[in-house]
Regions:
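Interfacial loop-to-helix junctions that mark the boundaries of transmembrane helices
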Residues: 82-94, 131-137, 164-180, 250-254, ...
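Hydrophobic, small-residue-rich membrane helices and short re-entrant helix-turn-helix hairpins
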Residues: 121-138, 163-167, 193-215, 336-345
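Short helix-coil transition sites and intra-membrane helix breaks within transmembrane domains
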Residues: 10-20, 55-59, 195-198, 230-239, ...
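Juxtamembrane interface elements at the cytosolic ends of transmembrane helices
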Residues: 102-125, 153-163, 181-201, 327
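Core transmembrane alpha-helical segments of multi-pass membrane transporters/permeases
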Residues: 169-239
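Hydrophobic core segments of alpha-helical transmembrane domains in multi-pass membrane transport
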Residues: 3-8, 46-50, 91-109, 141-156, ...
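Membrane-core helix-loop-helix motifs of multi-pass transport proteins
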Residues: 22-118, 304-308, 323-364, 370, ...
Length: 385
């Protein structure tokens, strides 16, 4: 349960969680006498299936919110109405605990019995942390603390706060992505130079180039997504599809909970073939945000529905490069004969059960009428259209 929780909240570091948490989870599991591959699966499921949930506002919130606002602006060019990065915050806080509980339960009662006791096949050697590396970690931690204090001072002195010291709509939230970027950059530099990994700026450049080399396909995909979104805005095709779709759904009486569940399942299905959450939302938002607005739903609510469909099947899509990284690590260190089918077949029950329970949780939340974020409900505010 703890590993599942750590994996879920790990998305504050975005995709880094998928790389770091599964190997660490394997070591923890092996340390308590459990099968390390199960630990990798639990850590991976938490980081992937629970990717959209967090106790804090993360970069994912800001990224999706920006795409949602672009869709609103394309639909109503003269509007000042926007959604905030916190528009799904309340719902996602409780979803974090839900994801951890469901993933933990599934791992204990469904995955662990399949693998049984670990017999020690494979090579799993834990390298000892050197004194220099410990100094690097201390330097990174100290840097993070100082940086957070500076940000807090900026907020409470009014530089990063909104009107009347408000958190919602503040420059702190609007600039969350660059703030997190600088935080991780400073921590990385502090560790690198203290631990001796970096000697000069050339070493930093080489490390950045090495990591960005694997992002080439994603950058290329983002380019075509940008062209797609630009063409949609120029031709107004998204608006036409939204109006036609909204009229058709309203005429058929297909609204409310059935519509919400159908949209969640659509996103869940497409996610198996296109694993990037931002890329899918860049395609979906120009169509579905206006469509749901015409049906009377808040754009933040539509974004929430997308996130509910986008997360659980992250764990089972073979299109994600991270599941292949988990497979390679498992084969190298713990189970030489494990295949991709074994991983997916064990992760599939987690994805399905989590999706079902999450949708039920959403329906209860929706029927009660609780806000999904500060000042955000399911209904579109009066006077927007």
């Amino acid at each position: 349960y703890v590993i599942a929780f750590v994996g879920t909240v790990g998305n504050i570091a975005s995709d880094t969680a998928m790389v770091v948490i599964p190997p660490m989870a394997a070591i923890v599991y092996m340390g308590v006498g459990k099968h390390p591959v199960v630990g990798m699966m639990v850590g991976y499921a938490g980081a992937q299936a629970g990717f959209t949930a967090n106790l804090m506002v993360a970069g994912t919130d800001t990224l999706l919110q920006g795409l949602t606002n672009d869709a609103i602006k394309a639909f109503i060019p003269d509007t000042t109405f926007q959604v905030d990065p916190t528009c799904n915050w309340f719902f996602m806080i409780f979803s974090t605990l839900l994801c951890a509980a469901v993933i933990g339960f599934c791992s204990v009662h469904m995955i662990e019995p399949r693998f049984g006791k670990y017999e020690g096949a494979g090579e799993a050697k834990l390298e000892e942390v050197t004194p220099q590396q410990k100094k690097g970690l201390n330097a990174a931690g100290l840097t993070a603390i100082i940086y957070i204090i500076i940000i807090a001072i900026g907020f409470f002195t009014g530089l990063l706060s909104g009107e009347n010291g408000e958190f919602i709509g503040s420059p702190l939230l609007k600039g969350l992505i660059p703030i997190l970027f600088v935080l991780f950059c400073l921590c990385g530099l502090a560790y690198g130079f203290t631990a001796g990994t970096f000697k000069n700026a050339v070493d930093v450049n080489k490390a950045m180039s090495k990591q960005m080399a694997g992002m080439g396909s994603y950058v290329l995909f983002c380019f075509f997504c940008g062209q797609f979104q630009g063409l949609f805005n120029w031709t107004k095709l998204g608006t036409l599809l939204a109006i036609a779709g909204a009229d058709g759904l309203e005429a058929a009486g297909f609204t409310g909970i059935p519509l919400c569940v159908a949209f969640i399942l659509l996103c869940s299905f497409v996610n198996i073939f296109v694993s990037s959450g931002s890329a899918k939302w860049a395609i979906f938002a120009p169509i579905f945000v206006p469509m749901f607005m015409l049906l009377g739903y808040h754009p933040g609510f539509t974004q929430l529905l997308y996130r509910l469909g986008d997360s659980p099947t992250n764990a089972v899509t073979p299109m994600s490069p991270y599941i292949w990284m988990v497979l390679a690590t498992a084969q190298t260190k713990y189970m030489k004969d494990i295949k991709i089918g074994t991983l997916i077949s064990n992760l599939l029950p987690i994805a399905v059960i989590l999706e079902v329970i999450w949708v039920i949780f959403f329906i209860i939340w929706y029927l009660i009428g609780l806000p999904i974020g500060p000042g955000v409900g399911s209904a579109l505010p009066v006077g927007i259209l």
